[in-house]
Amino acid sequence: MTLTKLPSGAFVRVLEMESKTATILCIDDEQTALQLRQHLLESAGYRVLGAKSGSLGIKTFKSEPIDAVILDYWMADMNGLQVARELRKINSAVPIIILSAYGELLDESLGIADLWIRKGEEDPQYLLNRLEQLLKSKPAH
């Protein structure tokens, strides 16, 4: 495994294994949570880009081909809804999953996020299954 820094400042770990075609952007300012999520997704065969802030996530989203985004709601520089709104302006077709200690918020019904998952209660297999469903329902590039 090698760690590669992208021009946007985000990083990607390259595993020596067959990869699914989807690239997932994970945005979380908690390093441990970000690493655990990256490991889960990489183990499932996804290419994973990690960003340690909302602003870095937006920069990465603009500069890399992204198939889905998983982001934390509560971050220091911007909250998950602010980030999701900016991402939707750039490309509204990319599925967005928000992880939140607050559970589902009203904004989900307004189309900001495709899915809300309560942090601490998330089942890794549930996250992978829902991600796969969202990717399958996504319009082709």
What is each PLM-predicted segment?
Residues K62-E64, E86-A93, G111:
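Conserved phosphotransfer cores of two-component systems
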Residues D72:
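Active-site residues of response regulator receiver
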Residues M1-T23, Q125-H141:
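Non-catalytic signal-transmission and effector/linker regions of two-component phosphorelay proteins
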Residues T21-T32, R37-L41, V69:
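Conserved acidic segment of CheY-like receiver
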Residues M75:
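Receiver (REC) domain active-site loop signature in two-component systems and cognate sites
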Residues G45-K52, T60:
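Short hydrophobic/Thr-rich beta-strand motif most characteristic of the beta2 strand and flanking loop
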